[in-house]
Amino acid sequence: AFGRVDVLINNAGLMPQAPLERRTLTDWDRTIDVNIKGVLYGIAAVLPQMQRQRGGQIVNVSSVAGHKVRAGGAVYSATKHAVRVISEGLRQEVKPWNIRTTVISPGAVESELPDSSTEADVREAMRAFYAENAIPADDFARAVVYAMSQPEDVDVNEILFRPTRQEY
């Protein structure tokens, strides 16, 4: 009832890194709720309108961690891999409506993400890593604009990028 929806930037995430043996069940639930269900709810909110208008673009934000898991990051990596899988399934489903789907998997980008860990030692380590490695949010924005600025018959399905100096 609000008119056209041309683009959804589906970008929300929590990154509570911790070894599985710590059994941070509350963090796991929150991470799954935000990183997976949040993406699904965003899609559900715009998909009917995009189908009616026979076009649009959904940009889901994953992470380098959705491609590679590190010790302490299994749950986060699993949720970000799920975003990639959801995005590919969505891409296959929405082709008849000319809806484009892109999944963007950034490495360390300046944001409040390192603050999302409830484990003090992990939070401080992530803050230090981001302080040394993170690239400006403008670099992320340029990746989004690249995907969005392609001709209507071109669908950039996946972009994986990270700071040059980032190890993984």
Predicted regions mapped to residue ranges:
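Active-site loop immediately N-terminal to the catalytic Tyr-X3-Lys motif
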Residues: 21, 68-74
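Active-site-adjacent segment of SDR/Rossmann-fold oxidoreductases
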Residues: 68, 89-99
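C-terminal helical subdomain
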Residues: 99, 103-104, 123-168
